[in-house]
Amino acid sequence: MHIKNIFIFLALGGLLAACGGGAGRWSVEQNDATTAPAAMYGTYTDSSSHRMAVLLPSSGDAGATGRAIRSSVEMAVLESGAENLNVSFFDSARGVDAINDALNSDPEIIVGPLFANDARTVRELKASGLPVLSFTSDATAVGDGVMTMALMPTNSVESIVREMQSDRVHNFIVLAPDTETGHLLAGAARAAANAYNVPLVGAFFYVEKDSDSIKSATQLATMNVARTAAHTRAREILSDILTNESLTSIERSSIIRQLDKLSKNDVIGDLPYDAVLFLGTGDDTKSLASFLRYFGVGARDAKMYGTAMWDGADIASDLTLSGAKYAALVDTSENFVTKYERVAGAKPNRLASFGYDATNVAIGMMYSDKSNAAYLLDPSGYVGTDGIFRLRPTGDSERALRIMQLTGDGEVKVVKEAATDFMSPLYNIEQRHISPMGELSLQTRGVNPMNYITLPERIRGKYKSKTYGANMTAQTNAQLVDVVTMLPEDDRDPVVTEDYKPVKLAPVVRTYIDSIEVEE
């Protein structure tokens, strides 16, 4: 029965099945899993009354998101058939007043809140033994009984860097948004690079949805100025030789062939990396990939990788990203999607499915004979609507991810299935130990055009060139001098955004840039 903002389920009869245990300790060490993840669904009977508070925004800018999660919470409560269960909803958009109201309702567990700041406030005000299942992905906002159901950014980054190791990537760079989240993700990439021995050799940041900023970041990352200058100088040398030197027919043919080859490209020079990891949204990634190709770095030059930020993005048919891989959650349960659409009139996003699982976990805890900590922190985890997951004593979550690959023809294929249990550890890094990363310039000896053209030995000594290189920090063995070093200048303040949230991204019509003229 629905009364205002409260669901009340009263027992009509039935035997006592189990009573919720005590809080337990949130700091306990989590042992290795010994069994498969448990299913969370069933019918719960108990003669004791149980109370659950739900803290979600129902008004304000995030009201639509909160209402979407609420629909899944209500679904889970109704489907559970739990007896003597009282569920109260509180509008977290009201701030600390709503949090105090939720705490004063004397709940056994709180589902929510959505944002990190609210989670911190709840953590500060709640009793130490009260468990909270939030939806923030900020590791600094959880702990001390506040847990999260969200996908932690480190899970996604570590999964894809591990795939890079499997692909035998030698060195990689990251392209990330110049936001708090972007710098944190870059830090996660650095930690994963160290853990899996895949060197991270460059990090470049851009303003989201800003074409000029994206262009500048990719131009810098591709060493475009140096590689273009080296290309120009190589053509000059070959043209001078063809015009001014007395050549044999074989020598002349060789020079002409090299000039013809150079005419088909705008740059020369090897890159100090063979992979690119995109840490932004799918739409920004498409722009970045187009500029990379424009500046002479395509899929043949560097393998491309992404994170769960691509999940749901309109990116599958992008030819510039053909072959790119990314980490993603498994498809949401079709059964849940069908039921949710029938109830809410719209497809569920990932947060809605997280809310459904959070509610089932909460109900299971209240009706369990285990302590709260023992139930919630079960090392075997649970089977949810988006695959298996488990909660950690630190408050973080772990979710099994699969590896997807873009085929370039609108299709996405699974190249590595998600794990189905936690018998072996899935992750080695924790977000709370990650430090945000700043820009990392490429360490390169630059580009000497003489290394990319072949001259007759008898005249080679007459022609020389300086080495061109952007952000050149490694020592060069060449005897040529006048090395040009070009450093980026950027006095913009970082752009701070809301919490990272693994929600489905709305498709945006792409504008191709193939015809843009780039001024050097």
What is each residue range found by the language model?
Residues 2, 6-12, 19-520:
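Extracytosolic ligand-binding ectodomains
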